[in-house]
Design a protein with these regions (language model features):
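PRPP-associated nucleotide enzymes
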Residues: 1-128
Length: 128
């Protein structure tokens, strides 16, 4: 069991260590949905190209980490675990855009081919 699978490198190393220690089979369970989308709001995350679940199917990820089986928590399961009956698709109760790709505001430059500019919400003027 792991909390998330981002690039897959840690899971791959842990699974290898388990096999090297004599484990016969490894069945990996991830306690989050697949992370398929990057964060553009300040969380230091890999790009979409680097996110394993954005580029591979669950069976391909399973082979990559050398596990016998692999399962992720579903979006519905995440919301139920957090005490919600279901996800509000219009106004999600959780920050879940890493899993759904539904960002709170429209992302204009998803390809990253333009220079990113950070705008401050804090005024630096003396009129505060």
């Amino acid at each position: 069991v792991d909390d998330s699978l981002v690039r897959g490198t840690t899971a791959h190393k842990i699974v290898k260590m388990l096999y090297d220690a004599g484990t016969k089979e490894v069945h990996l369970r991830i306690a989050s949905p697949e992370i398929k989308y990057p964060d553009f709001y300040g969380v230091d995350m890999p790009t979409k190209k680097e996110l394993l679940a954005a580029n591979k199917s669950v069976s391909e990820i399973c082979k990559f980490v050398s596990a016998k089986s692999l399962k992720f928590l579903s979006i519905d399961g995440l919301y139920k675990a957090m005490g919600f009956e279901k996800r509000n698709s219009t106004y999600p109760q959780l920050t879940d855009h890493y899993f759904t790709g539904e960002y709170p505001v429209k992302i204009i430059d998803e390809l990253g081919d333009r220079k990113v500019t950070q705008l401050s919400l804090l005024s630096t003027g003396s009129n505060n």
